[in-house]
Amino acid sequence: MQSLKKSVDDTGNTNNIVSSGLPLDKSLEKIESSKYVVLGNVDAGKSSFVGVMKKCILDDGNGYARSLIAKTKHEKETGRTSTQSSHYIVNNGEITTLIDLCGHEKYLKTTMFGITGLFCDYGLVIVSANSTLEARGVTMEHISLLNANRIPFIVIVTKIDICPENILISLKKKFDYIASKSKKKILYFEDSEEEFNGSYLKESHQILIDSFQNRKTFVMPVIMVSNKTGHNINFVRELLTSIKSRSYLERKGLIKPMNKLSDKYPMIMYIDSSFSVPGIGIVLSGTVKYGSIKVGQKLFLGPVNNTYINITVKSIHNCISENVDTLEKNESGSIGIRLDTKGSFSKEMFTKGQIVTNDFDFAMKNTCYSFNCRISVFNHPTTIMNGYQTVIHCKTIRQPGRFKLNDNQVLRANSTTSLDIKFTRRPEFILPKSIFMFRDGRTKGMGIIEGGIPFIEDTPDIIKKQKKSVKKIPEKKIGK
């Protein structure tokens, strides 16, 4: 573990990146970034694990590694992550992204956005070794979200250095149950993996990587680690950086695309946040899902006021803040834009859920208020009837939608049906075969979009504003 501690001074804080120490060889073949969402219950050690992976240090058992990556003051003080944040490991030109998400149930909508809107390839479920997995706990909810979105995941068991043997045995039984329910083969990595010829990965591990990537054999690796003692930390880091992204595997023909129509799509960049930078202007951050985007390219941004406005790309930065000329498929970054459409536009008009594309007609055709879908209701306390409203999470979209059912039709838990859903606020860009989630209170479910009605052929619902109740104050009688 001395190599871990030595590299602290070499990493620095520049761009929040940790490098493997190998030179970046630009002549190497282009390899897209692998993205992992880091999930798990509160106090499981997610941020500490990400801090150890990113900074190449060991934790002191009192939140030191976590404090190095905390974004806000209250996160440093309380240790509770309330926002999603991305952290990067650069290894010989390949970028591995760790997306640290919230573990508290209060911030579940932020976690759902991270899973659906940040286009991750794999998941890391962090479980504290000295805790129990409750059937209705947050960890099980996160696992169900990953399974619903067809995202393979690795289970990382932290705090293994302070775990009693009986608790670990009980935890393994829970993992066996989860694997059998998901029809996955479980693989345990308990003992400390030794380095051999400069690598912690052996032939048996390569078989694991291949089965994890091609998804023909469904596996659920469970790795025991300790952020404090360094147990299996180097092994996990090398394993994560060795697994290739889904985009790279599709390009190589090793796996089939989830959506067969994706080859016919134009360039699409999904926006997950926007900024107004003094001296620069509007900056949009997001992921290029299809095609590529270049500096100087003239594109369309929207939907903005039910249309798409003309923009020009002035500058591009990749996910590690490097100034680049191009963002390729599956790469995340930010673009500085110039608005070419005349009009009055404010920063508030550019939000998550919008897209940047080079095909105006394609964008208008797929911008809808209403869409047809097939849904499955996982949980609901009573019955769902016509007009039921819930929040739809689809890629970077997060907007209330209203169910359109027949008057005599009702849905209950474990129901599956086809229906129309209508957005209540504004039209959104949606594509067929997209997976979406809906959640509201104790209601949970998912669906697959089958098609939409272009908003120019549809009419928005009229939202009735509720009158504010004014409490009448009785007049005081003035005595004579």
Swiss-Prot record:
Positions of region (G1): 40-47
G3: annotated span: 100-103
Region annotated G2, chain positions: 79-83
Keyword Nucleotide-binding applies: yes
Matches recorded under Pfam families: GTP_EFTU
Region ranges (G5): 226-228
PROSITE patterns noted in UniProt: G_TR_2
TM region(s), chain numbering: none
Keyword annotations of the record: GTP-binding, Nucleotide-binding
Spans annotated as G4: 158-161
Gene3D superfamilies: P-loop containing nucleotide triphosphate hydrolases, Translation factors
GO MF annotation terms: GTP binding; GTPase activity
tr-type G domain mapped to chain residues: 31-248
Residues that bind GTP: 40-47, 100-104, 158-161
Domain of life, source organism: Viruses
Matches recorded under SUPFAM superfamilies: EF-Tu/eEF-1alpha/eIF2-gamma C-terminal domain (SSF50465), P-loop containing nucleoside triphosphate hydrolases (SSF52540), Translation proteins (SSF50447)
Family of the protein in this entry: Belongs to the TRAFAC class translation factor GTPase superfamily. Classic translation factor GTPase family. GTPBP1 subfamily.
Protein name according to UniProt: Putative GTP-binding protein R624
Species in which this protein is naturally found: Acanthamoeba polyphaga mimivirus (APMV)
